């Protein structure tokens, strides 16, 4: 009869104790691979069981002092070249499997350069199984008799497990297998001969203190991270020979407990080591490997084999699984085989191999960055964000580094000299990883049911054996009683035999009683001795306890003293922090004030330099102006005197000819050798002054009349016309216009119309006219042909065949003198591909087609005026370079501080006093406008829209 079913005890609330605050560092182990050839150079040396030395091989660059560098690195354990897989498993993986069975997570990954033995360490080889098959063997050896039936535990898509009853599990088995209920096999399943040698069943390994009142289920999954994409290696995809499908990548998600998992990953329930390793081997065949220059079978992806152990307690009767989802404990052990870091200059990778190597190195670099940030946060107390999401590898195992299990790393090292630089980087990463601490996982919660429920229904006393009990042995030692039937009165044998037997039995009883008394006395003596020793121990313990209490009281006093001292120091620190804050604020204020003073000094210095440049420019401009004015006046005076002398000479010659010769003859051409030899400097125009309207009219009429007569070039064969007649003729033509022109009005006219004034001066000079002191226009008798000859003689000869192509790109010579001042204008000249020089030279001109000179002078308003003089560079006949100036650009900066009042036009007609002026009338002045029609092809026009206002009678 079964006992009544007891109530299930609820899961107690876990109080955060001191255990949750404990942290363990990441366990880093090192394994050295044997050399492929005995005569290879080695750069790694094992010092002891925890120290490894790395020295620079021959042929590498020496240190500054000429010695080879030797560096030692410490690990939790160093495994030499002769270490077996069993020794490595017992030290590294055995504790992780034991924690897995007790409900704790674990992470084990191998790290190293390519060809260092990571895959061998994790998987193994025929006859020498690696860590993975040994972990599976230990798990099934520990929970083999406590496993639940298949499909009792069922996984869902949310990284959790569900419990099914026996009936649902049976239906699920029949549905999936489509077979009747299978019988328990009489013998174990035979392993695949391809990997049978890797599973060594002779080496029995089992975890201790396995919970016998729980049932277990094992689920395995196998994924790979290839080019930062996650692929399921256990996914069954139907092969289509016509249109094969590429494997679909999986995504990472977060469950309700903030644990990361691969969504849609296949989880296979296994019941034995052979079955689990067969699933692993099926996925291993799909893993991406390739042949490289350094490794014949190089892993091109990171592989993750996860073992998920699900355990649930039995009910109060010990017959079935407890149907409560909250009581399920899920623990996971992830075995990660990282792809090796490699250098492309050694592997000679190209194409896809190069892309794979880049992604592998990038993910490993992200792992290293995460470790460095974790170490920095734990060492300095910072709160920097750990970049887990930069790589799928680190994002998947984020929970392990945040305190969800133990983390172990095996650093595989190849001791050959060619891998020295890569091994050095691996050692540095291992050094950083050892300093990272991970929170210790919490122990599994006890369900609260009575232990030993599994064996409660078995017969009391356990199984009966063949050995007799102690009371039966004692009874069998007595002699048996003889038969007591008396068949005859004279029977004398039965009674004596019975008496003899009873005497023997009585003797044995006395012996046993004596023995019992002796044993009782001995037991009493032992009990007294035990009591005495116990009292002595109690006294000793009491003495020790008193001593400890005294020590504790002393330590409490010391703690109180230290706490008071700590409070005092904290108060001092707080005061110092406040003082430091005040000093820092004063320092910032002083720095800001210093910066403002520096800026002010810089502005004053720049203003001073600008003022000096302005004054220097004004002085230079004034001196040049007066120098040019003096030269102009001297040249004008010389020219006037020469003209007067020439006129007098001509008159004297004519008079002499008239007096000496009776007949009029052809006058000889005067000698011009003196005038040709003497070069008359070009006079500078006088300062511009406005002209009055009357003077402008006179000058314009005079220019029209002056332009009418055309002087022809004289030759020796011309008619005999006297010079005096020519002079008189010109004087008669100029007599109506000989009114002197006001200098002030002429200057004003030139200021208003500088372009016209320049044109007049040039045209007058070409016609042979010059301005005298009386501002009279005197014609000279230089011919047009002479002017052309003089012009051709003064210009630089330029060959026509050296004309530059207009389609070719031009290059400039940017001539900026060293005395120029840097302006702060927004608009700055920008010439690409220009050669900037401070002094023009032939080398720079030979390379360019354009020339520009930046000239600065002081304007009338006191500001700096920058002129950019542009020109074309040509080759001369002599092999040199010449510049023909073509354009001038003026850059000027002014302040908009002028008067808002419009200045009246100087061309407004003067009105007599007392009359109203139409020029000042608003209606009259606004009746004229410049207008341009929308859509018109013509330019702006001068339009008149309104009638001027009538005058009052």
From Swiss-Prot:
Region (Disordered): 658-695, 894-921, 934-953
Pfam families: Kinesin, MKLP1_Arf_bdg
Low complexity composition bias: residue spans: 681-693
Residue ranges of domain Kinesin motor in the record: 25-436
Listed GO CC annotations: centrosome; cytoplasm; Flemming body; intercellular bridge; microtubule; midbody; mitotic spindle; nucleoplasm
Keywords, alphabetical: ATP-binding, Cell cycle, Cell division, Coiled coil, Cytoplasm, Cytoskeleton, Isopeptide bond, Microtubule, Mitosis, Motor protein, Nucleotide-binding, Nucleus, Phosphoprotein, Ubl conjugation
Residue numbers carrying Phosphothreonine: 739, 920
Covalent crosslink: Glycyl lysine isopeptide (Lys-Gly) (interchain with G-Cter in SUMO2): 572, 587, 625, 648, 663, 666, 816, 847, 867, 870, 892, 949
Keyword Coiled coil carried by entry: yes
Residue ranges the record marks as coiled coil: 542-618
Entries under Gene3D superfamilies matching the protein: Kinesin motor domain, Kinesin-like protein Kif23, Arf6-interacting domain
Subcellular locations according to the entry: Nucleus; Cytoplasm, Cytoskeleton, Spindle; Midbody, Midbody ring
Residues found modified as Phosphoserine: 155, 160, 606, 683, 685, 807, 860, 904
InterPro entries: Kif23_Arf-bd (IPR032384), Kif23_Arf-bd_sf (IPR038105), Kinesin-like_fam (IPR027640), Kinesin_motor_CS (IPR019821), Kinesin_motor_dom (IPR001752), Kinesin_motor_dom_sf (IPR036961), P-loop_NTPase (IPR027417)
Subunit structure: Heterotetramer of two molecules each of RACGAP1 and KIF23. Found in the centralspindlin complex. Interacts with RACGAP1; the interaction is direct. Interacts with ECT2 and PRC1. Interacts with ANXA11 during cytokinesis. Interacts with BIRC6/bruce and USP8/UBPY. Interacts with ARF6, forming heterodimers and heterotetramers.
Protein name according to UniProt: Kinesin-like protein KIF23
Gene from which the chain derives: Kif23
